[in-house]
């Protein structure tokens, strides 16, 4: 029998809340994530399974999967296949830092788009002088490619944090109360470590963190090191701290680069990672189980007798 596991922390909260990074746990090796679980409350889990060829397994049945809490059976009360899509928000720094690399940035974005699955909904925004749509959410790749040429330099400082906060707010509103037509948001942003145009208060940053966690957002970041400009200590480090924290919380990828030429090869790498994540996240099983009376969940495991499977078990369905 093969299994995968998650570690939990008990809490007095009445609902299951993912408050720390939840990592997909492989059947071969078991990296473990955490979540807050209230004793006696039903536990909701997401199980993603693929075969030896990496193709999603779409015919698992409830009787083939055993959920246990701290070694005791957790009775499955609901077992359903989900096919939630990925919705990708791409945010691009168009401040003076990228003036000399505008052609490279556009070429990198085109390569990025070409590497994405065509069924992923994409939106494209620039971040200076404020976050604004260059291409609104859609799947028309011809129009998206044409929109890349509309990214033009602006003399103002980029608003890296504001762009992420607004994207998180949109995702939260779109997902609010949705049982049908749910989705997994992914944010990809290109920024720089120079002066930041956003001036967020602590509560606004905390809201950004909270919304990304609660809505199973994955955040990926490319940060260009701007050696030719002096950092503004008051604002120039804010986007770095926020960016690092977001990628740590959501399991995303953070890359600091020194040369603009790296964009051409790096952005397609991100697209490939997003494509793989999309394939796994979009075909999962949402499982609800009831822990035994008196249980104070610390460890949740899933086991199956089905051979030749590789699986990921999470509390929110996010597989970066």
Predicted ranges, named:
Residues 36-97, 106:
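Eukaryote-biased intrinsically disordered, low-complexity acidic regions enriched in Ser/Thr/Pro
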């Amino acid at each position: 029998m093969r299994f995968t596991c998650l570690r939990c922390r008990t809490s007095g909260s009445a609902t299951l809340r993912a408050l720390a990074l939840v990592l997909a746990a492989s059947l071969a090796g078991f990296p473990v994530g955490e979540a807050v679980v209230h004793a006696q409350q039903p536990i909701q889990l997401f199980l993603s399974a693929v075969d030896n060829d990496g193709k999603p397994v779409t015919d698992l049945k409830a009787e083939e999967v055993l959920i246990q809490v701290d070694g005791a059976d957790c009775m499955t009360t609901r077992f359903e296949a989900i096919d939630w899509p990925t919705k990708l928000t791409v945010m691009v720094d168009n401040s003076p830092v990228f003036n000399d690399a505008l052609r490279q940035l556009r070429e990198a974005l085109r390569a990025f788009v070409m590497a994405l699955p065509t069924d992923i909904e994409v939106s494209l925004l620039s971040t200076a002088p404020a976050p604004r749509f260059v291409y609104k959410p859609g799947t028309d790749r011809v129009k998206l490619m044409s929109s890349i040429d509309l990214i033009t330099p602006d003399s103002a400082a980029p608003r890296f944090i504001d762009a992420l906060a607004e994207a998180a707010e949109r995702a939260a509103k779109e997902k609010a109360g949705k049982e049908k037509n749910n989705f997994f948001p992914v944010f990809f942003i290109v920024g720089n470590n120079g002066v930041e145009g956003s001036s967020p208060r602590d509560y606004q940053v905390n809201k950004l963190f909270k919304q990304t966690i609660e809505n199973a957002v994955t955040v990926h970041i490319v940060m260009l090191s701007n050696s030719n400009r002096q950092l503004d200590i008051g604002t120039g480090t804010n986007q770095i701290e926020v960016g690092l924290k977001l990628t740590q919380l959501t399991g995303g990828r953070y890359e600091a680069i020194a040369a603009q030429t790296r964009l051409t090869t790096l952005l397609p790498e991100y697209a490939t990672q997003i494509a793989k994540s999309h394939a796994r996240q979009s075909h999962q099983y949402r499982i609800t189980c009831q822990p035994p009376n008196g249980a104070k969940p610390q460890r949740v495991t899933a086991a199956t007798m089905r051979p030749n499977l590789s699986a990921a078990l999470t509390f929110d369905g996010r597989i970066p």
